[in-house]
Amino acid sequence: MSLKILDPYLLDSLNFMRNKESQLSSYRGKSPQLNKRRLLVDWTCLSAEEMSLPKSSQHLAIVLLDRFMDSHDIAIESLHFICLAALSLAAKFDCLESKVPKLSHLVKLLDVPDSCKPAQFRQLEGMMMGHFKWNIFIPTATHYVELLREQILHPTDLLEGISIYDDYHEVDDRLLAFVTYFLDIAVQV
């Protein structure tokens, strides 16, 4: 599929993301914890929503979680810590500093909040960053949607032969809701 993109910045960004994707090692899906993934993804998404983090942070956290679990045999009781560390790293990468959750807020999401000391959590984040060679920009579906959203719909588009100009914002909101729905499903797969 080829897109006709005229904006050179957008084209450069798209090419950069495609290049980053091509450099990723293959995801093997061999994690011993794979049977827990669905629960971990649900918990991570709910935690991200509770902290008002954007979808891009949720998706990046889940990609980090998947890829980290794919290479490590993690004790069941540590999986939620890994989720929180992935969420923290994704937020630090993806959000303004004011939106990055504080460690004290993160550990409140755990069943046993006192079980995670700040030094242990920072060490876990460091271990994860080391695993990713300190490069956690992994393009996700949400990054592509954010990048291409303005290319998808334009006020001069027609709907059943009628201009959407007067209803552009309503159509755009519906489109975003529809895309968000599919992004929520995609993260589960």
Task: Label the model's feature ranges.
Residues 1-84, 88-167, 171-181, 185-187:
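Acidic, Ser/Thr/Pro-rich regulatory low-complexity segments at or just upstream of the first helical elements
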